[in-house]
Amino acid sequence: QITGKVVDAQGDAIIGANIIETGTTNGTVTDIDGNFSLSVGNNATIRVSYIGYLDQSISTTGQSIFNITLLEDTQALDEVVVVGYGTQRKVSITGSIASVKTEELQNIPASNLSNTLAGRASGVQIIGNSGLAGASSTIRIRGSFAEPLYVIDGIIKDKAAFDALDANEVENVNFLKDAASAAVYGSSAGNGVVLITTKAGTLQKPRFEYKTSFSTSRTTQTMQGFTATEELEFLNNVAVTLGQEKPYGPDLFEYFKDKSYDINDLIWQNPSVQQHNLSVNGGSDRIKYYLALGYHDENGSYHNTDFKRYNFRSNVSTNITDRFKINFNLSGNQRNYNRWYWPYDGAEDFIVSDWYRATFNWSRLYPFYVDEQGNPTNDPNDIPVKTTGGYHPPEIMLNGGYRNTQYRDLTGIIRFDLDLGEYIDGLTTSVQGHISAYDKNMKSFVLHNKWYIFQPASTTNRFIPGPVDFSQIGIHNLSAGYENIQENIDLSSSYQLNWFLNYEK
């Protein structure tokens, strides 16, 4: 048992400091007087930490009472944080702000910025709603029920523009969590503000940087936890419960003892992600520049599901005089979401619950594809046969059409900064103009879902397939009585003009 007290450099108690036994989850926090007690192992080492202070690791060997002084992390406190009306040092901020540096995010194989930020800012809930390629996450600040306001380089944008950013081009992300911090944005900031600052040029020789990554993943467990023989046993038990004879005998159990038709073998795959980013950063006393190109390619867990994103950014600033500066920030992105056609979930809905419902408990007793002699195969180039649902999910996914959506966004920001210090010391003014062009193109192509009627080998063994009868055809169309193609195009643009007058003393 060890006891002690944690104070700062002035001798004031630190309330809520963390004391953790290194290498374990055993720990405690200091009380209102800075005191603590903790049971630890022999010769243990404890780690003492608190936000804004430098961590300390202390050996407990030969000692049971500790007086610990934590020193301020001056580097963290001097760090500049972007707020609604400019920048401030962390030590001067009284409002509630959480900051995330993006160096740690750049190698995470996530499809968008929302997903990479999960768990990295206190008071910010980031929840993924779907595992489809390109799917985003919801962001809620301090338990609010609506989206926060998104501000990118001083321009109010929507969640889609935030998600379209490449983590490599982002300098930092700040979450303004209370009314005092977000007040400059008015009522639209009632659910908090997410402030994003993209990278800019620095005073150095041209520095070229190329980053690439590749990752893949697999399921930790099978989606269907039953076999064909277990399904036969279940159906027999249902019949007995209803007072009927068991419909399936030993011959079928013998036939299925080494085979099961798993729909997931045809519709699921191991997803993969590759990312590439090329940038150049440099500048002189007069001009600074940052140029970047990004590419993200993601293959989803379902076949025929993928997401691609292309990004570019050009951020150039020039000092016309010692007091007058111009900055031009041009960026663009294109996002391609491609997937199979399934009309019973929303056109832009990443929560494909109806598809999941339709495939989750699919029978293990019927093959999906056979050759001409009726031998079961897993080859989608073979002959599709009718399933119990009246439609053919693998054929729909692999050969039944598509729904492809493309988004493109081009944004230009120009800013003029003038230092008026020769008239009033600490006075500056800025004018910022912004224009964006956006388009969306959604194309859906629907094919007939064609299959052949399942032919059993005999009337007594209805699950054992026989040769295909090519005169017995079934067609299930998902939208109408004919094949069709549909295309929707949306075009929009926006502009914004801001004027700032700042005084800092």
Annotate each language-model stretch with its function.
Residues 113, 409-411:
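Short, solvent-exposed loop/turn segments enriched in Ser/Thr/Gly
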Residues 1-313, 321, 325-327, 331-333:
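Short, small/polar-rich motifs associated with maturation and membrane association
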